[in-house]
Swiss-Prot record:
This is Vitamin B12-dependent ribonucleoside-diphosphate reductase. PANTHER family: RIBONUCLEOSIDE-DIPHOSPHATE REDUCTASE, VITAMIN B12-DEPENDENT RIBONUCLEOTIDE REDUCTASE. The active site is at N375 (proton acceptor), C377 (cysteine radical intermediate), E379 (proton acceptor). CDD domains: RNR_II_dimer (cd02888). GO terms for molecular function: ATP binding; cobalamin binding; ribonucleoside-diphosphate reductase activity, thioredoxin disulfide as acceptor. Its EC number is 1.17.4.1. Gene3D superfamilies: 3.20.70.20. Induction: A member of the dormancy regulon. Induced in response to reduced oxygen tension (hypoxia) and low levels of nitric oxide (NO). InterPro entries: ATP-cone_dom, RdRp_reductase_class-2, RNR_lg_C, RNR_lsu_N, RNR_NrdJ/NrdZ, RNR_R1-su_N. It catalyses: a 2'-deoxyribonucleoside 5'-diphosphate + [thioredoxin]-disulfide + H2O = a ribonucleoside 5'-diphosphate + [thioredoxin]-dithiol. It is an enzyme of class 1 (oxidoreductase). Provides the precursors necessary for DNA synthesis. Catalyzes the biosynthesis of deoxyribonucleotides from the corresponding ribonucleotides. Keywords: ATP-binding, Cobalamin, Cobalt, Deoxyribonucleotide synthesis, Disulfide bond, DNA synthesis, Nucleotide-binding, Oxidoreductase. The gene is nrdZ.
Length: 692
């Protein structure tokens, strides 16, 4: 450092940080690249001139930026100065917008992320104003979760709170939304989702409905198997009347979820599963196909078996069984029912399929029962009253010097497993059955987000063999690290109570019956500023609805690449926004077009291949949408569903573009056409309920 340079920089919030001339040089370099100024010595020369002009002491950040503008002007670099000034103006506008929202954002999140955090995550004072900053939100969650550490090593919670906070503040790992929302609050419910049982009695149906309302009020999602309810028209001995059937109660549950969500912090999200052998399966399959607005809070999935799908393949008959009596009440061609499922999914995305036999072959505690349902997005098959405590590693933050930082990935995975295990201990459970089930198996779900961004940063097309191989390797390493961490926790704290009844009883003890699961990540990937789960990018440039306006947004990875390589232009971005993607766009280099495919530009087979590759190293399940073009046929849906079964994934969802009104990503903007996204959309399914 020069003897006459500043020692410190005063940020806008008043904090002091060391002066770093490399940051000035990097900013000038980015501006120079945008105007194709290829003098390699210029940025360093300008940065040194700025440092010399500032002198010793403490330099306010605004003074530094003013000095950069002045030195560029003096050097006759007017084009570079113009780009630098525009960048400053945009940053100033962003700070102003955040200030108008009343949010202090030391994490430098996107405006969309800050908007969502303000509405649903940050604590507020009595006047409704945010009472904490974005960083303080992360600190609150870290402290709350780390409190569990004192149960096992008194006095250790402060140390672990600091480690947890580092992960959260760096956006290297984020837990599911309720952990961020409810940590340190009176609600205290930190688990993301639950499966609740519904038995064949009015008492059970309404008792479960009441429990669901309590969970949804606290931001928890709920999954149900309606398979035990007697079919419509069946005899009710106590009244002499007839049953209304599971679909009628499904509508009741949906209405209740809508009412609860009005007073809650996010829209109610639910999953309904009905066994393919239920006599009312045809009504269930078409429950949402008849009206796009029907059952808005529910995802629907048919619980299919290997026997049913083999009957489809050989054009055999399928038996429908009354769950009350266990007797066969009808037989129908399996292919006819499968066609009805595929037609409904083609029409609106529902129902998906849940492969019950595949799920139960991997059930870690088969002695505790057969799994019949999943959480709302399908990534965690659960027994009754079990919960999913989810968190995701941000793969986009696992890069160093243009390569995957495998050591950091394993370190983050290990700390994340400990975090999620602590969540089980500190979470409050509204009903004793929930706490008992959570502690019995201590299931957690460590997953990922940012896969598509990582691939793009490495120049690897999502729809390529190289991408599938890398995704496989990433998930294998994460699962191995998670297993190691869970075994270490078992040595410190003991195995999960149901260990002796588990598939692992003959192997070494584990703290958790399940450690990995890949969630869609929904809002948390938006907060982290990366792509959702293992989904591809949904658009490269688009407009996002924020506080009543549609603001142009560019994928951050593409934005950085375009500026670094010198082809960023405002008119270029406007053209891309009209298209959504860049595949087939002649103005960009071929390798850039290949590395930035959008979900709609990727063939369905590649979507499924990626899901299957990741599933091989995930103990629970993988939430992934197979996107289909608007021109896709029912036969295309049929082919994907069969291929998914044979690929041994645990569930499958398809979404044909434009098949549902109100989808959260569309090109239905006024002329000129622009890809549009809702405030909270970060990728994945553009039509189903994916709040988590």
């Amino acid at each position: 450092m020069g003897v006459s340079w500043p020692a410190k920089v005063r940020r806008r919030d008043g904090t002091l940080v060391p002066f770093d001339i490399a940051r000035i040089e990097a900013a000038v370099t980015r501006a120079a690249r945008e105007v194709a100024c290829d003098d390699p010595d210029m940025p360093g020369t300008v940065a040194k001139a700025v440092a010399d002009a500032l002198g010793r002491g403490i330099a306010p950040v605004e003074d530094i930026q003013d000095c950069v503008e002045a030195r560029l002007g003096e050097a006759g670099l007017d084009d570079v100065a113009r780009v630098y000034i525009i960048y400053r103006q945009r940053r100033a506008e962003l700070r102003t917008a955040k200030a108008l929202l009343g949010v202090r954002d030391e994490l430098k999140l996107s405006l969309a992320a800050v908007t969502v955090l303000r509405e649903r995550y940050l604590l507020h004072d009595e006047q409704g104003r945010p009472a904490e900053s974005t960083g303080e939100l992360m600190d609150r969650s870290a402290r709350c979760v780390a409190a569990a550490e004192d149960q096992y090593e008194p006095g250790s919670s402060r140390r672990w709170a600091e480690r947890f906070a580092t992960l959260l503040r760096n956006l290297e790992f984020l837990p599911n939304s309720p952990t961020l929302m409810n940590s340190g609050t009176d609600l205290g419910l930190l688990a993301g989702c639950f499966v609740l049982p519904i038995e064949d009695s009015l008492q059970s149906i309404f008792a479960t409905l009441g429990q669901a309302a309590e969970l949804q009020r606290a931001g928890g999602g709920t999954g149900y198997a309606f398979s035990h309810l007697r079919p419509a028209g069946d005899r009710v001995a106590s009244t002499g009347g007839t049953a209304s059937g599971p679909v009628s109660f499904l509508r009741l549950y949906d209405s209740a979820a809508g009412v609860v969500s009005m007073g809650g912090r996010r829209r109610g999200a639910c999953m309904a599963v009905l066994d393919v052998s239920h006599p009312d399966i045809c009504d269930f399959v078409t429950a949402k196909a008849e009206s796009p607005s029907e059952l808005p809070h529910f995802n629907l999935s048919v619980g299919v078996t290997d026997a049913f799908l083999r009957a489809v393949e050989r054009n055999g008959l399928h038996r429908l069984v009354n769950p009350r009596t266990g007797k066969i009440v009808a037989r129908m061609p399996a292919a006819e029912l499968f066609d009805a499922i595929c037609k409904a999914a083609h029409a609106g995305g529902d129902p998906g399929l849940v492969f019950l036999d595949t799920i139960n072959r991997a059930n870690p505690v088969p002695g505790r029962g057969r799994i019949e349902a999943t959480n709302p997005c399908g990534e965690v098959p659960l027994l009754p009253y079990e919960s999913c405590n989810l968190g995701s590693i941000n793969l986009a933050r696992m890069l160093a010097d243009g390569r995957v930082d495998w050591d950091r990935l394993e370190e983050v995975a290990g700390v994340a497993v400990r975090f999620l295990d602590d969540v089980i201990d500190v979470s409050r459970y509204p009903f004793p059955e929930l706490g008992e089930a959570a502690r019995a198996t201590r299931k957690i779900g460590l997953g990922v987000m940012g896969l598509a961004e990582l691939l793009a940063a490495l120049g690897i097309p999502y729809d390529s063999e190289e991408a599938v191989r890398l995704a496989t390797r990433l998930m294998r390493r994460i699962q191995q690290a998670a297993h190691t961490a869970s075994r270490r926790l078992a040595e410190e704290r003991g195995a999960f109570p149901a260990f002796t009844d588990s598939r692992f009883a003959r192997s070494g003890p584990r703290r958790n019956a399940q450690v990995t699961s890949v969630a869609p990540t929904g809002t948390i990937s938006l907060i982290a500023g990366t792509t959702a789960g293992i989904e591809p990018m949904f658009a490269i440039a688009f407009t996002r609805a924020i506080v009543g306006r549609h603001l142009l947004e560019v994928n951050p990875c593409f934005d950085r690449l375009a500026r670094d390589r010198g082809f960023y232009r405002d008119e270029l971005i406007a053209e891309i926004a009209q298209r959504g993607g860049v595949r087939g766009y002649p103005r960009l280099p071929a390798e850039v077009r290949a590395a930035f495919p959008t979900a709609a530009e990727i063939a369905p087979q590649w979507h499924l291949r990626m899901q299957a590759a990741v599933q091989r190293h995930v103990e629970a399940a993988v939430s992934k949408t197979v996107n289909l073009p608007a021109t896709a046929t029912v036969d295309d849906v049929r082919a994907i569903y069969v291929a998914a079964w044979k690929a041994k994934v645990k569930g499958i969802t398809v979404y044909r573009y434009g098949s549902r009104e109100g989808q959260v990503l569309s090109s239905a903007a006024p002329k000129p056409l622009l890809a549009q996204a809702d405030t909270e959309f970060s990728g994945g399914c553009a039509g189903r309920s994916c709040e988590f």
